[in-house]
């Protein structure tokens, strides 16, 4: 069995009471402890607001955290539980994920879903499509992710999403 753990990042109000000046150190300390205890992986949530009640309390963005933690840990696999597909363009997200995978020495775990937290969509100006449309977007995004990591000149035109030829990214 392989075991991972989450670092605090604010989404579950797990940084409440920690001053802003000490929040990053709190996250780092948790990551270091997870690594010292020989866990296999470290996880973050892909959310922008707290839950169960949206507040203005700090919530650290997952891809920014994984980028930083890729440089402050040595052996932990790094994952998101799970990336909301419709928060980021699939071509852009593939680029970010590929970069972090390279920066971390191949330690990225890539988990993605269709999204559900309507408050975050609205707060950040994203459309909140029906579940069926979000699932279709996820389906097309997975094709784009695969093409961008395996094809020399990836091109895709779906019902909802498309991509033009772009440089091939590092393999996820």
Language model features with spans:
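N-terminal beta1-alpha1-beta2 module of alpha/beta enzyme domains
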Residues: 1-72
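Flexible, glycine-rich active-site loops centered on histidine and acidic residues
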Residues: 2-22, 85-155
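A structural motif corresponding to the C-terminal end of an alpha-helix
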Residues: 33-37, 72-76, 144, 148-152
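Short beta-strand segments at enzyme active-site cores
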Residues: 40-46, 78-80, 109-113
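Short linear capping/connector segments at secondary-structure termini
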Residues: 46-50, 81-84, 125
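Glycine-rich "substrate-gating" loop/helix at the edge of Rossmann-like oxidoreductase active sites
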Residues: 54-57, 83-88
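Short, charge-rich binding segments
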Residues: 68-77, 101-105
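Single conserved hydrophobic/aromatic residue that forms the stacking wall/gate
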Residues: 162-172
């Amino acid at each position: 069995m392989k075991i991972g753990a989450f670092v605090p990042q604010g989404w579950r109000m797990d940084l409440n009471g920690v001053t802003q000046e000490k929040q990053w150190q709190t996250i780092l300390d948790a990551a270091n402890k997870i690594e010292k205890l020989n866990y296999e992986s470290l996880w973050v949530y892909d959310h922008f607001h707290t839950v169960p009640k949206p507040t203005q309390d700090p919530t650290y963005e997952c891809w920014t955290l994984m980028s930083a933690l890729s440089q402050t840990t040595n052996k932990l696999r790094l994952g998101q539980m799970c990336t909301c597909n419709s928060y980021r363009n699939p071509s852009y997200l593939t680029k970010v994920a590929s970069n972090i995978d390279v920066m971390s020495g191949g330690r990225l775990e890539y988990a993605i879903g269709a999204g559900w937290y309507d408050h975050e969509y609205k707060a950040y100006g994203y459309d909140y499509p029906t579940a069926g449309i979000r699932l279709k977007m996820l389906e097309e995004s997975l094709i784009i992710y695969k093409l961008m990591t395996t094809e020399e000149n990836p091109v895709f035109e779906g019902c909802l999403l498309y991509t033009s030829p772009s440089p091939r990214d590092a393999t996820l």
